[in-house]
């Protein structure tokens, strides 16, 4: 045994050095994680400042901006909105993992094409089973398509969070479905939301989507005006991009309706959410109107009861 090995002070120093190395190895990833989420919060606040002109002046009659992009294999819709809800309220109901799954189902079922939403496993599974229909009308579950979304509380920092819902596959040979919500605190009673809805497809999926749109979606439009600056009247985007814009807006209105009714008595909240969602969607009837109010309310009441019992 060497003198160094017999020296208690030397051994103590080596143990301390190894302890510091281990702590550093554990600490550095955490620093990266918090730095990343802090950067995300800074980025989202900067984006809010850049989008202020669009939030102040738009055709939506609310402080929001909608954008979309389509490539050969992916389509994405995004809504940016300033809402009059405290950040803590938004975070507690949409980013709180033990209740987040159930809360997301409560709001997703407001979308007219969503026919069923349940968390089939335990909270640790972080999975949502979602049934969607081709048409905005009542449908039996065997006639719908089931997607399995994984819920992920992706990032969290003071005054900021991001959650992701992701499904590997969908109908019509589509794949990689994503619903992503991030939020940042603006003040004591205001929050800036960024919602993304996206999916991907290959050549077969793209052809299937075009066939679907030609059959079920003829004449339907989105929100983006694609007419030139000298055009006499607006010309709105259609096709796959128009479809994703409509659905992105429907999901955003569901989030807004859910948040708007949290202060109501629990036994009144669902009915109020239905009314709030339908009234909001009718503000954009040219893009979103499919069925009348009573049809929507009756359909969703039936679907909600089914969701609670099956």
Could you say what each language-model-derived stretch is?
Residues 31-35:
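Sec/Tat signal peptide C-region and signal peptidase I cleavage site
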Residues 84, 150-160, 182-192:
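A short, structured loop/turn motif at beta-sheet edges
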Residues 74, 112-174, 178, 200, ...:
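Glycine-rich portal/gate segments that line the openings of hydrophobic small-molecule binding cavities
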Residues 1-15:
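N-terminal secretory signal peptides that target proteins for export/translocation
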Residues 19-30:
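Bacterial N-terminal signal peptides
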Residues 66-96, 119, 239-243:
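Terminal, regulation- and interaction-focused segments at domain boundaries
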Residues 92, 96-121:
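N-terminal segment of the mature soluble domain
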Residues 36-59, 64-65, 70, 80, ...:
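Terminal "cap-and-tail" regions of soluble proteins that handle hydrophobic small molecules
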